[in-house]
Structure formats: C-alpha cells, structure tokens
Amino acid sequence: MRLCENQMKTREFTQILQENPGKALFFEYQTGQYVRTDYHITEIKNVNFDTVDCGGIRNQWSEVHIQLWENEIPEPDHAVDTSKAMKIFEVVNRVRETYSEASIKFEYGNSVFPTAVLPVHNIKDTGNALIVQLTPDQTTCKAKDRATSPEEKAAACCGPVAEKPKLTLVSLQQSDSNTCEPGSGCC
C-alpha cells in the first residue's frame, strides 16, 4: 500500500485508517514478528525534541509516538481495528490536537524485544487487514550528515568512517613433517 522512503506523517497514517474502516490492524515490529492481536493503544504522545549536536548546532523537531501495549494475560476477545484506532485519535484530539504534520512512530516492547520507538516502513493492505510494518531507526551524527565541504567533514567530530584495512595472504612454507616448531615459519 505505502512504502515509506521518508518517515510517515501522522496525517498520512490517520488518512489510511479513515480510508479503510473496520479492517483489522496489525503491527509487525521485526520481519515475521507481530505485536499480539490483543494489543492496546495506551497513549498518543506529542513529543518535542530540543537537542544540541556534537557540532554545537541546536536541532528542534516534533514527533508523534503511539504506545502499543500487550496485557500480561492474553485477551482473546480484545482487538483494535482501524475504526477503533481512529476513535482513540478522536478522544485524544478532543483533549489536545495531535501533531498532524509530525512523523509518526510506534513505541513497543515485550519480554523478548526491548522497548523501542519504531518508524513506519510500509503498510500492507491484505484486503481485510492492514499490516503496519515497523523498522528500527539507526542513530546518526547530525554534524557529519550536514557536512557538505571537505572542511566541514574534517571538522565534524564523528568524521568519515575509516576504511577497513585490507588483509593480505601470507604464503606458508611447505614442511616435510606434520609438526610445527616456534620460529619455523609453518604457522
């Protein structure tokens, strides 16, 4: 349905929910690993970041984090579909507006997967369900990322990644015996 080359905006996500009423809503947090079908949406967070990177530049941005939670005791009669998810957004928006133009991410963890904030990679429509495929973010160095000139790249505290040293093969001397003595050159 939608492959996200850039991070999905909250507005895009809610639009997909609205266009697909009553469909099951599943989350894949790793390839082949799914949030249990009886999950709850427990919070919708407007998150504001105000950071200073290692190059001394201030960075500010906002995101929306949706917290997914699984009860310790499975609830086979509980499920969140696209319509119920939209109702939760509506409840939140009655209290305060959700940042519609901010990137949307999902906060999830369980006993075998540490809690992480995961962006949307893709949303698959199977006909009767939407599968939101999440993927982990990579950390990065903003000073290195914004450097465009050789001088800026050299000044970034994280600099370019050094190339791996090339390994060379060393010839082994042939020996008539199957033993190896220190200093003999056989190993």
Per-segment meaning from a language model:
Residues 14-43:
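Small/polar-rich, solvent-exposed N-terminal microdomains that initiate assembly or binding
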Residues 34-58:
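Short, solvent-exposed beta-alpha or beta-beta edge segments that form flexible loop/patches at the rim
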Residues 23, 35-37, 60-64, 100-102:
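A generic structural signal for short beta-strands and their flanking turns/coil linkers
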Residues 48-56, 72, 89-93:
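Short secondary-structure capping micro-motifs at structural edges
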Residues 60-72, 134-136:
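Oligomerization/assembly interface segments of phage tail-like spikes and tubes
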Residues 135-178:
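Mixed-charge, glycine-accented linear interaction segment located at domain edges/termini
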Residues 88-145:
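Helix-rich interaction surfaces within compact, conserved domain-sized segments
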Residues 2-4, 11-12, 73-99:
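Charged, amphipathic alpha-helical segments and their flanking helix caps
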